[in-house]
Amino acid sequence: CANPETQSSQPVLLHDMRKCVSCHTCEQSCPQKAIHFQKGRFHHDAQRCNGCQSCVEMCLQDALQLRGEDMESEAILHEVMKDKDYYDMSHGGVTFSGGEPFVQVTSLCEILQEAKALGLHTAVETTGNYPLADLQRAEPFIDLFLYDFKHLDDAKLLQFTHGNGQLIKTNLAYLLHQDVHKVIVRMPIITGFNDEASLVY
């Protein structure tokens, strides 16, 4: 999913209300007071949460899980290389997705460079909504760009996704000038947003 407007870059606490018995143990164990129940419903304040996982560890019903984790480049590549035989057999490789991989451009470039040194095919799912300098930095290490282009109208794009349409077009033009064969442009068709015939055809 290359939709950074819908993704958090931090680990996320998930609550399964089917398992929860509203015992309030999680609320009582949270040192940041990031959890409370209101009218029997679980509420989590992500701004206050520091990810300590006290609530997860104390929940006797396993109704809480923390998803997402910080990983060093070496750990990511170690996971990727577990499937190296499969990549070799299938002519596959590694695809960086998100959110938006370019949000962490320094780490992305480091991992891409190491992946290329290990002989891996690299692909990136992207919205193109970041500085051209970041793209220029990473582009030499990317074999394929899966470029999501959500709307041609800059105002509508800004209104619904907070994206910079001019920047997205500039980055796409740069990539197409570098090597048109490295880019697959995709436009997800979303009812009421970009499904007008003039945009699709």
What feature does the model see in each segment?
Residues 11-13:
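Well-ordered beta-sheet/strand-loop patches within structured domains
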Residues 18, 46-53:
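Cysteine-rich micro-motifs
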